[in-house]
UniProtKB/Swiss-Prot annotation:
Listed GO biological process terms: COPII-coated vesicle cargo loading; endoplasmic reticulum organization; positive regulation of ER to Golgi vesicle-mediated transport; positive regulation of protein exit from endoplasmic reticulum; protein transport
Residues spanning the signal sequence: none
Protein name, UniProt field: Protein transport protein SEC31
SUPFAM superfamilies: Functional domain of the splicing factor Prp18 (SSF47938), WD40 repeat-like (SSF50978)
Function summary: Component of the coat protein complex II (COPII) which promotes the formation of transport vesicles from the endoplasmic reticulum (ER). The coat has two main functions, the physical deformation of the endoplasmic reticulum membrane into vesicles and the selection of cargo molecules.
Family named by the database record: Belongs to the WD repeat SEC31 family.
Alphabetical UniProt keywords: Cytoplasmic vesicle, Endoplasmic reticulum, ER-Golgi transport, Membrane, Protein transport, Repeat, Transport, WD repeat
Origin organism lineage: Eukaryota, Fungi, Dikarya, Ascomycota, Saccharomycotina
Polar residues bias locations: 1037-1047, 1118-1129
Subcellular location: Cytoplasmic vesicle, COPII-coated vesicle membrane; Endoplasmic reticulum membrane
Domain of life: Eukaryota
Amino acid sequence: MVRIAEYSRTATFAWSNDRIPYLVSGTASGTIDADFSNESKLELWSLLGTDADKPSHSVSTDAKFKDLDWSADNKYIAGAMDNGAVEIYEFNSSKQELKKQGSFKNHSTVVRTVKFNSKQNNVLLSGGNSQEIFIWDLNKLLDSKANYQPLTPGVSMSPIDEIHSLSWNKSLAHVFASASNSSFASIWDLKAKKEVIHLSYTSQNTGLKSDFSAVEWHPLNSTRVATATSNDNEPLILVWDLRNSNTPLQTLSAANNQGHGHSKGILSLDWCQQDENLLLSSARDSSVMLWNPQSGEALTEYNTTGNWCFKSKFAPQAPDLFAFATLDGKKIEVQTLQNYETTLDEEVSKTKQQESETDFWNHVSEEKAEIKSTVVHLQAPSWYGNKSASAQWAFGGKLVQVTKDGKGVEVNKPEITDLKSDDTLKNALASKDFQPLINQRLVKVVNETNEEDWNLLEKLSMDGKEEFLKEALELDEEEDEEKDQEGKDGDEFFQKIESNFQPSGSFKIDSNEESVINNILSGNNSKAVSELLKSGSILEAFVVAVTCNDEKLKEDVKDAYFAAHGKESSLSRVLFSSSKKNSDDIVENLDISQWKYITKSIYNFHANDEVERTNKLLQLGDRLLANKNRQDALVIYIAAGSLDKIATVWLNEFSTLENKIKDQEKTIYEAHIECLTEFVERFTILSNFVGKKQKITNESLISKFLEFINITSATGNFDLALLFLDILPEDNEYVIAEKKRVMVASGKVVDQSQSRKGKYGSHANLASAGFSGHAKQPVNLPPTAAPFAAQTMGGYAPQAVGAVPTPAVPVPQTRNASVSIKSNPYGPAGTNVGTSDNKFNAYAPPTHTQVPVATPVTSSFIPPANPYSNVAAQSLAMAAEQNAMSPNLAGSAPPVKSPSVYSGQTPHLNKKANDGWNDLALPVKEKPQRAKPVTVAPSPILAPATNGAAAAVPTKSIGTVFPPTGGNSRVPSSMVSPPPPQKRASRTPSLINIDDVVNARPKAHTSIYAPQTTQAGPAPVAPQSDIPLAPTANPYAPNQSVGSTPLQKPVNPYAPPAQQAGIPSAANPYASQIPSKAPVNAPPPMSSKKAPVGPPPMSSRKKAHEGKTLSHEAASVLDSSKPVQTQPIASELSREPAPVPTSASQTQVPPPVQETPARNTISPIDMAAPAVEQGISAAQQPIRDFFSSELARVTPLTPKEYNKQLKDCDKRLKILFTHLEKNLLSQPTVDKLLHIIELLKEKKYHEAMEVHKDIATNHAEEGGNWLTGVKRLISISEATA
């Protein structure tokens, strides 16, 4: 038996109209529980609930239920009570709660049945004894409960007494049917206000009229209705067509189905709303029958273990499920229609028959009887038989479906209007501003521990790691002040000693000290110390050892002191560790409540040993964690820079947070997704502030990130998935597989089968890459020269400028020429023996080959610039011939994420520090100089276009041309500059991440092969023109004159470039070269001035320092005069390459944009365009006045241990005032701040906190660091009110 759920209640029930339905049960009238309790309850059950004995919600009632019904909109539940009342309950789906709205006693006796109208959710029918049928309008009923009077249906044509069943017509909202014990079923029309038809049936066997116990309308046909008889001798289901109401259209009985049917009176009917060929009935014989009311066939018999199965109902929106209730069995059971005996059941039966007698009697009391259904006629429901659209969700949130004709497949991505994507995390990763995300999380924390974590991150984001640790690890302010005062007194004390003591007067050597004094005066200090130590004069021994400055004697005296007094005081223990410069004893044995002293000893004793300092900090963190000081342990792990330890702590708590979210009435999947997202956000923010350069090695952590990436990709958010994939280690096989999958699904990797491979890699077809939105701009240009023509250039050789284009005869590009005689790569051009293979020699000079001359042709191809030439020195009037190392791409293409392309040399552990392996790691400022002249024929100066197409200046499409994906394609020089010329076979590939360069901000670099030019900002876009583009010059070979047109001088690759107005220099060799009419200055470097910072969260814990067992002397020993060092663990990933020496001839390079440090992280509004301080407006002045006065009010009322919180609150509020002065807040945010002030004045602190949450949720980007200050002030104001 396919049992879905079973509830041990003797109760009637009703289904909700949900896809995953709820079930509500009410204690059945006329029954007594097993414990003889007379208690009555209305209980709500969820089919997804794990505990069948615990309802989702329960309400006690004054009477028991005869019937229950649920409105079609799921809002109201009506109960027919045995005390003559109709009770209305409201269902809150979000909280899964039932709330009683009223009890209405208009019936004179018991109410037997209630029924909601399926067309009008507010209309309710109720039926009872004494011909009482009432019609209720819930809208009016709930508005005026005391004065409301229900309506009656009108005049009855037939005698009726007890109303057993009511049913609304499914097509006509004003028509309903009733069944009573008077042998009549009545059809009522509310428009006519009377009974319009009555039905009766006379038995052919007995000649007596049968009483009707149930009535049910056809789901589609308004003239067809079914009735059931309660006669135990002849139980029948009669289907009527009202157009011929004298004779039943169909009779459903056991006699007509070879004995398959009910044997006793039928008590309920339910006609399936989704399939008119299915009718469910239950009877006193404890059976449930499934019928085909159209053909009259019995389909399936569902036997129950109880007696009197008085109600059975399909789930309205999940008709494959049905429930039935029994009296004797004391249960409500939910089953599925697929309750058939399977081969597995047969095998179980055979196994039981083969077991021994002993096993049978041992298990007979434990086994639960499972009664299988009897299939009379197998009939599939219509929702299985109908052909539905064949569809399947695919990776990336796409929907794949078969077309209506069944001959094709459609793939699309549905847009869900009610589903709003939250891009807060994605925006935070892009801008490195995590404050909006932190603000949102602080107002929806999971539990107290989770709130402490987000408070810690908020403090980190405001102060930065260094300031955060400095404040977190210092002792209380009072102790610091006393220490400073004691330091001053100590200096004065020593000054007094030095100035006041002067020996005077006569003295005599004591006889007991003669031997010691003799040794001292004789210079025998070793014996003197030995005698002093034997006599216990350790102080005098110290003086002798210090005076003679003998290190061995000093050690002996110290050893003697510690042997005698080491266990007497904490000062002695600390002095021992200090003398040895060893923190082992303090780290292992000092009371963990004084962990800040332990931290001071670690930083003092291991100031120059980073590895040992980190190990000791981790040891201290483990002690704190074992002692349940979780938050202090996290602070120490942050000081040690150990993301792995913090990740382990958070991963261990993952299931706890997930269960907490699950308790908030969310499904298991929803709770898991929300918890996983929160964890990823939390760890991402932490790693950004603590261990940005660290490599993730924790397998469990990688697994969580991969799960998040998989879910993110499944929704189509590939950009966010790729951002996280770049964080994970590239050598992990699962990360590699996931990255390939995401890259292919996002269309950022070109299938190798669609690429045309050449000698230097595949030349991808732009169309096959899936790029869109960038139209190709047609430009006239000459065809490229033949592979062996004189104009054919190497991969790093720009061609001569101003040369007459020489058409080429198409020659297939084969990987191996038939004859290949390699020339000297450094020799002069022009020597060609036989056939050369220079087309594929990246460093070879051009050769001379006679080719036929033809007129230029128009092509839509826009060649990319030579990535290894000096871009700024080339005139924009010339065009580059196709680079042998570049792909055949044109137009503006989006950045292509390439899996590890190959390059010339391996940059050692420097993936993101610089874009080029031999570029300068630091900004270099040098005086720009013009290039030295080269002895070549002068070239004509190209003037701006005045008239005619010939004078127009061509330009490439606005955008960037990128290298091909995959293969052995070369990479731009902004990533890896070329090594000296060498043979191709000697090149060693290395893995380079192209996205790090493409998506990076432009930086100025220098290269020993490609001198840089002065960086300029973006130039205005000029209109494109169709003009042939000339080839570029070769910096490694003399220029060849073709035709009579004079050549423009080539670029000297080892000399500074000449400055030319209107040509923006490209730090990125793939950036578009856009001409301008005037020089454009480079943008000034971003200011590194520290941004305003905001306050820590209110709930951050203030731990009182427990230092009662450690003396101030010990604290003075631990405390060093040097500042506390907070150096992170050294990591190879964080090392920057040494700067490459540059010559004085290099041009001046403005410094690149510096990455904002963690401590300066502010919201985008803080980074907004120049904000001019305009002063706080009159409308906003109350914000400053009230917050300032309120802070002044609470300050003297707040305990001293919260002084830090007050100072922090003051600092954050000053940030808010600065924002107001600069007019950086939007009007809605200002209005809400003013509303908070009004609520605080009225002492409505809870409402004020809700407005604060609204700002944090809907205006998180404006909240910045000041928002926590407002929250803290609200809390302190409430505490001191």
